[in-house]
Design a protein with these regions (language model features):
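Conserved ATP-binding N-box helix of the HATPase_c
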Residues: 23-46, 99
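Glycine-rich nucleotide-binding loop
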Residues: 73, 112-119
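Glycine-rich/acidic phosphate-handling loop/turn and adjacent ATP-lid/helix
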Residues: 61-94
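Conserved short strand/loop->alpha-helix "switch" segment adjacent to the catalytic nucleotide/phosphoryl-transfer site
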Residues: 10-29
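Short conserved segments within the C-terminal catalytic ATPase subdomain
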Residues: 2-10
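Short beta-strand/loop element within the Bergerat-fold HATPase_c
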Residues: 49-61
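Conserved glycine-/histidine-rich ATP-lid loop and adjacent helix of the Bergerat-fold HATPase_c
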Residues: 95-105
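Glycine-rich ATP-binding loops of the HATPase_c
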Residues: 104-114
Length: 122
């Protein structure tokens, strides 16, 4: 889907031990995060300016996840969480938070200089 939208997608995954996680939880987390990033990038008129980066690494026996993408339409936040008022949207972010909290992790959503970032440590 990202390739079809002309999005420059870059991955760096150095973490190797995911054994303590249910695969469905990880799939849900990454699928929702990437779907949101793709949706934001698709709004950018020039495909050459669209990008998503994903980094997954281990630090202090935790899995750290950083996903960043550019955007054109400023995200709306309520209580430091991005929200969508479109029908059937916003459930993905709640699902992401649920997965992070299930593994007693911490997360954050940030914007800076036209870049949206999701960071989590599980």
């Amino acid at each position: 889907q990202a390739r079809d939208a002309g999005i420059d997608l870059r991955f760096s995954v150095t973490a190797t031990d995911f054994s303590r996680f249910q695969i469905t939880d990880l799939c849900s987390l990454f699928a929702n995060a990437l779907e949101n990033a793709i949706h934001a990038c698709e709004q950018i008129p020039s495909p050459k300016k669209r990008y998503i980066t994903l980094k997954v690494y281990e630090k202090n026996n935790r899995i750290c996840i950083h996903i960043a993408n550019n955007y054109i339409q400023n995200p709306v936040f309520e209580d430091e969480i991005p929200v969508s008022h479109e029908t059937r949207h916003g459930i993905g972010v709640k699902s992401m938070i649920s997965v992070v909290e299930k593994y007693h992790g911490v997360y954050g959503f940030f914007t800076e200089n036209g870049e949206f970032r999701f960071q989590a440590s599980l």
